[in-house]
């Protein structure tokens, strides 16, 4: 009876004492236990002194005590009553889940996003419209300036050009009248044959015609001379078209042909700096220019003109797409440069 009471008094009352006694019976130190359990020595000391660290949750503390008990061969059933007193399991208080209006917040966020998107879109459209209007206004001002310059140049050229003086045609009329009058001494029949068979003589000044005296020719000699002149005149007349064809000028290889489908302001300058044309060209008209290549062109409305250079059309589509004043150079190799 006394032995059982003594045994109960000597029995440890806490988990820390029970684990410390078991460790000492195995001859282990706190350092060895800490190394085997991968814990700090201070944590092992707190467990043996029944201290619960403030920064350590009860769940972790119960796990450390169970690991310590397995290491020193102490049954867990022996430690459970003491463990329940030392590190009671705290029931987690689960707070009721608050319901959030996710749909409303999402709609609100989407509304802000859409508003920002529309704002950016309006800004981009406004900037694009302002840029286009500035370019259009600048082009119109440039076209009006060029038209004013061309009008001033045309008026200045008209003021500086000399007035045309009519030619005196009295001497020519007298000469033609003298040549048309036949000599009075010739017979009428021979005169008609001579006038019909002989080629028309080259006109000479009226003073020489008036000073010459008519020559009387016998009828037989007049007929002979007329036949001879007729025979010699026919080969010369047959060779005349060949000579005219051989002397016809060749077409200009640098010819510039422009057809206008609407009113268009135009300025064309050749390689020497000479302005071949500068002014307003009306609808349904064409313009043929010739000069020294390359040509420098400035066209106010590229969509209103069709250009052919060296017999080939010139592409103006890039200027038509951007709706801007066309500035280009046509060189001898049929290439277009801006």
Swiss-Prot record:
Classification via HAMAP family: RodZ (MF_02017)
Purpose of the protein: Cytoskeletal protein that is involved in cell-shape control through regulation of the length of the long axis.
Domain called HTH cro/C1-type: residue spans: 19-71
Transmembrane segments: 112-132
GN (gene name): rodZ
InterPro entries xref list: Bact_Cytoskel_RodZ, Cro/C1-type_HTH, Lambda_DNA-bd_dom_sf, RodZ, RodZ-like_C
Name recorded for this polypeptide: Cytoskeleton protein RodZ
GO terms for MF: DNA binding
Keywords of the record: Cell inner membrane, Cell membrane, Cell shape, DNA-binding, Membrane, Signal-anchor, Transmembrane, Transmembrane helix
SMART domains to which the protein is assigned, alphabetical: HTH_XRE
Annotated organism of origin: Cronobacter sakazakii (strain ATCC BAA-894)
Ranges of compositional bias, category Polar residues: 147-180, 189-214
Membrane side Periplasmic: residue ranges: 133-338
Domain text: The helix-turn-helix (HTH) motif in the cytoplasmic domain of the N-terminus is involved in the formation of spirals to maintain the rigid rod shape. As this protein is anchored in the cytoplasmic membrane, the HTH motif may contribute to protein-protein interactions to form the RodZ helix, which is localized beneath the cytoplasmic membrane. The C-terminal domain may be critical for determination of the rod shape by probably interacting with enzymes required for synthesis of the peptidoglycan layer, including PBPs in the periplasm.
Keyword Cell inner membrane found: yes
Cytoplasmic side: 1-111
GO biological process: regulation of cell shape
Region (Disordered): 147-245
Major localization listed first in the record, in broad terms: membrane
